[in-house]
Amino acid sequence: MRVLALTGSHDRNGFECGVEALNLWLRQAALQHQAKGISRTFAAVPLDLKETKAYRAAGYPDIVEHSILGYYALASAFILADELPAELAKRYPRQVPVTRLGRLAIRNDLHGQGLGRLLLADAVTRSRNAALSVGSAGIFVDAKNDAAARYYKQYGFTHCKDDPLKLYLPMW
């Protein structure tokens, strides 16, 4: 598997994660947001023809070279310091530059195989690399539900003040 910037050649219409809003956003908005500089989307795709054949042999006959196995989107944002956990808020000025992890989705039939962990690690790495050139104190995410919040917490994200679905991971 490799993670690439989303392009028009990736099969957005064949992606199904089980959450219609995430499917529709990928199909209808992701490339438009990239063109406007709003966000950047990164897609996990099969590494090569050999890996594509391995997926097919493992019971995934519809996975082809340009199939999207999972994706995430990143954007620059600001949050107010008083939204952060109290122990972190005191370290920052009133407005804190962050990288927003706007979406993270995995193909429905690939859930539970570690792909989400790999995409999250890629998102953190890209965010840290970008923060070396453009300031960002951490990664901010709005979890869609309690299960998603628990998922992010197991990778070091902490709840923001007054909202258990808003989570933050300091970069430094």
Where does each model-flagged region fall?
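Non-catalytic substrate-recognition and accessory regions of acyl/acetyltransferase enzymes
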Residues: 1-113, 117-172
